[in-house]
Swiss-Prot record:
Family: Belongs to the protein kinase superfamily. CAMK Ser/Thr protein kinase family. SNF1 subfamily.
Species in which this protein is naturally found: Caenorhabditis elegans
Protein name: Serine/threonine-protein kinase kin-29
Knockout consequences: Defective in the expression of a set of chemoreceptor genes, and exhibit characteristics associated with altered sensory signaling, including increased lifespan, decreased body size, and deregulated entry into the dauer developmental stage. Exhibit defects in food-induced quiescence behavior.
Top enzyme class: transferase
Binding site residues for ATP: 22-30, 45
Domain named Protein kinase: residues: 16-267
Function description: Regulates chemoreceptor expression by phosphorylating the hda-4 class II histone deacetylase (HDAC) and inhibiting the gene repression functions of hda-4 and the mef-2 transcription factor, enabling the correct sensing and transduction of food signals. Role in determining body size, the dauer decision and serotonin-mediated egg laying. May modulate the Sma/Mab pathway and regulates development in the later larval stages.
């Protein structure tokens, strides 16, 4: 046996034949292996202990301690811990479907019913960990595997830790895209609340197909996370969007707990079968490791007998190792692997423990005299076959060993889809699922049967098919009681002489396809639905009217925001209708560029302009009130343009009315004086100095300057004239203390407020408000450790306020010779 093992490249570690690597990390390598006695595939994580420092050694021992105490159906189960020289081996459950991340890369976002199933299983596992006082701290799609029947399995407890009560953690760990804001800021944090944030990011990825805070650097990620803005796509339901926002809350105290997650209404939108399965799952989860040991006190005698025959272990050794949960003993691992195999076989409906032979009503089932023999513990043939055969992952000995050393493209650690583009949402396609229900992608190939073999089978009888579908008038319908007398049409007396091919004896001819693991990827990995539909017979052409399409669309997507009936394809793009429609509808004469939106463009098309001018000329030609009002308006506007009527220093001009904020942005219109807010002006200017010039916001005003255009309420003095700013090289606190001392000397009362600016970066800011209408704001400049001081005058004409600002600025210049003006 040594020569074949060397030829196949298998390495022996304990009772395992170790094969190819399926994953690699900084200090560890994961390989696929096969247990000799249980004949089950497992995953072995090998770590070189000599290459680890003291901190990583502590984390490794903590991981070993955690995997020994956890046992949950949606957490990868560990079987054995082996220490050989400088190597540490962790034997765990093997999941053949790969990572959830690779599934999302291949198929894109999933439907909410699929996301609900996966997220519920993840939430149940996290709830179990938190009940044990364990925090994962590295929840992400790469650390979630898909097992049998697409069940979730959480892996990688390298960053996990124990947490009790209100204890806070300080270690920064995890992946930045999934990290909570308190971790990004380097503060002490609650590990359980950090897991909830990671779960919120995970759910967003499942339903949206992307990250909630996309960025290409850690600094940009911090700014995006600390802004608190989560943009959820329109196709996400209202309940799911609310659920995501409740988990992605910046304040950990207001963030959801795992109990709130399990009780959210989105988690309970499912049918009765799924509700019963979820309830049974939560009830079956043990709340502590003590209950796990109590459930395992009774051992399976069949497994013990099998282990005594194949492992040469005594009954006492098996009982001590299993009840003591000795992970460093091969006895415990062997028993657990065999017990899992028996459990899977029972759940899959393998039948009774002793299958019946014959019939209870047979005449041969009477009593018989049998000589009594001494009772000896034996293993039935069914149980022996169940334990001795390979697991569902291993077909046979040869196939298992060859799979361990498989170097085909499908066995590599790379993704199956090299384009890495999001495909059709998983769970939404109906026809595609019928063709993608196998793990391997199917490609075109030659037929299984040759033309000579196909010629040996008689052609199907068209007369028989016609008779089965539409019986002739000469044959009356057969009664229900006599239908079983003629199971095949060939047995009918009327068709006894007609040759009929027995299709049940023919070999099943598969489709023209083959596995992509052969190395010839002739077709893309994702099934092209359009090619399949092109081969189907064309249905009769019938084009629905616009009203019918509108009703159908609103019935499906009427609950979404910004949904408007009968929007033209020119606005939203999409697929144009290749065949024109000739139905008479109320919408056929509508202008093509017309749309119903508050963000409509102020410009008009040529068709609309001509139509409006035509209506205007027709209205002026008739001698009615419209003509008289038009002449009066022209006279008033002409008189106002020539005469200057002053009122408190402001010119009374014809106001320019802006319909939308987008129109203000295009014409660069400044806000009026009545809505002047010195606090907002100071925050904007302070952020421009601290973080540079910012682009124009969605409100519509430019970020640095204002236009000369004004409204009737705006004064002759601009906003920039009422705002003065300087930059001091003194520390932030000294500037605040100096300003407060100066105001106290002048006996001017003031009120102080402390604020934090979170966008685009967390910045500290203090504001001093004076009764005379002066607002003094001081902000921190993080890179240079300087202070940005800004004075804003609310009163338009107040010499006292200007004099006070000049005195305070002179005071700051005296104590700081290196000041600079803005």
């Amino acid at each position: 046996m040594a020569a074949p093992r060397r030829r196949m490249g298998l390495e022996k570690i304990g009772l395992y034949d170790v094969g190819r690597a399926i994953g690699k990390g900084n200090f560890a390598t994961v390989r696929i292996a096969r247990h000799k006695i249980a004949k089950t595939k497992v995953a072995i994580k090998s770590i070189d202990v000599s290459a680890l420092d003291r901190e990583n050694l502590i984390k490794l021992e903590r991981e070993v301690k955690i995997v020994k105490v956890i046992d949950h159906p949606h957490i990868v189960k560990s079987y054995e811990i082996m220490r050989v020289d400088n190597m540490l081996y962790i034997v765990s459950e093997y999941c053949s479907s790969g990572e959830l991340y690779e599934t999302l890369i291949e198929k894109g976002r999933v439907a909410e019913n699929v996301a609900r199933k996966w997220f519920s299983e993840t939430a149940s596992a996290v709830a179990y960990l938190h009940s044990q006082g364990i925090v994962h701290r590295d929840l992400k799609a790469e650390n979630i595997l898909l097992g049998k029947n697409s069940n979730i399995k959480i892996i990688d407890f390298g960053f996990s830790n124990f947490q009790t009560g209100d204890q806070l953690l300080n270690t920064w760990c995890g992946s930045p895209p999934y990290a909570a804001p308190e971790l990004l800021l380097g503060n002490s944090y609650d590990g359980m609340k950090a897991d909830i944030w990671s779960m919120g990011v995970l759910l967003y990825i499942l339903v949206a197909g992307g990250f909630p805070f996309p960025s290409d650097s850690v600094n940009k990620l911090k700014r995006s996370v600390l802004s608190g803005l989560v943009k959820i796509p329109y196709w996400v339901s209202v309940e799911c969007a609310d659920f995501i926002r409740k988990m992605l809350v910046l304040n950990p105290g207001k963030r959801y707990t795992i109990q709130n997650v399990l009780q959210h209404r989105w988690m309970h939108i499912r049918d009765d079968v799924q509700k019963n399965q979820a309830a049974q799952l939560l009830e079956a989860i043990p709340s502590s490791s003590i209950e796990i040991r109590q459930q395992s006190t009774k051992l399976n005698p069949t497994i013990m007998m099998f282990m005594q025959q194949h492992g040469k272990w005594s009954e006492e050794q098996i009982i001590d190792a299993v009840l003591g949960r000795d992970f460093e003993s091969p006895i415990f691992a062997t028993y657990e692997l065999l017990a899992d195999k028996v459990k899977k076989g029972t759940l899959e409906g393998t039948g009774e423990e002793f299958p019946r032979r014959g019939s209870r009503g047979s005449i041969l089932s009477g009593k018989a005299n049998v000589d009594e023999q001494p009772l000896t513990p034996t293993i039935s043939a069914h149980q022996l076959a169940q334990l001795n055969l390979s697991s569902p992952d291993c077909d046979s000995d040869d196939s298992s060993n060859s799979d361990l050393c498989d170097d085909s493209p499908m066995s590599s650690m790379g993704p199956m889809n090299h384009e890495r583009q999001f495909g059709t949402p998983h769970g939404l396609d109906i026809i595609g699922n019928r063709f993608e229900n196998r793990r391997h992608t199917l490609c075109a190939s030659e037929q299984l049967l040759s033309p000579n073999m196909m010629g040996q089978f008689p052609p199907p009888n068209l007369l028989l098919n016609n008779f089965s579908m539409n019986p002739p008038l000469g044959f009356p319908p057969m009664p229900e009681g006599q239908a079983a007398e003629f199971p095949l049409p060939s047995l009918h007396p009327a068709f006894a002489t007609i040759p009929i091919a027995d299709l049940s004896k023919m070999l099943p001819v598969p489709k023209s396809e083959r596995r992509a693991s052969a190395g010839e990827t002739l077709l893309p990995t994702n099934f092209d639905l359009t090619q399949h539909l092109a081969n189907l017979p064309a249905p009769p052409i019938s084009f629905p009217t616009v009203e019918e399409e509108g009703k159908s669309y609103l019935s499906k997507y009427g609950g979404k925001r910004n949904t408007v009936h009968c929007l033209g394809n020119q606005l939203g793009g999409g697929i144009q209708n290749p065949i024109p429609r000739y139905q008479r509808t109320p919408y056929t004469k509508a202008p093509p560029a017309e749309r119903r939106s508050s963000w409509a463009s102020p410009s008009l098309s040529a068709q609309q302009q001509n139509h409006l001018e035509k209506l205007f000329k027709q209205a002026l030609q008739t001698n009615n009130d419209m003509t008289r009002l038009h002449k009066e308006f022209k006279g008033l506007s002409h008189g106002c343009a020539q005469s200057q009527i002053t009122n408190e220093g402001s010119s009374l001009a014809c106001p320019q009315i802006s319909i939308t904020d987008e129109y203000n942005r295009q014409h660069n219109i400044a806000p009026s004086a009545s809505s002047f807010d010195p606090v907002s002006i100071f925050q904007k200017n302070a952020q421009e100095v601290v973080f540079g010039q910012r682009p124009a916001t969605a409100i519509g005003f430019s970020s640095t300057s204002f236009s000369g255009m004004s409204t009737p309420e705006q004064t002759t003095r601009s906003i920039d004239d009422r705002v003065r700013s300087i930059v001091c090289t003194l520390p932030f606190t000294e500037v605040i203390d100096e300003l407060k001392a100066s105001l106290n000397i002048l006996k001017i009362p003031f009120s102080e407020s402390h604020e934090m600016v979170y966008e685009p970066q967390v910045t500290e800011m203090r504001r001093l408000s004076l009764p005379s209408g002066v607002e003094i704001g001081v902000a921190v400049l993080p890179p240079e450790h300087k202070a940005h001081v800004e004075f804003a005058i609310i009163n338009n004409d107040s010499p006292t306020s200007e004099y006070l600002c000049d005195q305070l600025i002179c005071r700051l210049r005296m104590i700081d010779p290196s000041w600079s003006s803005e």
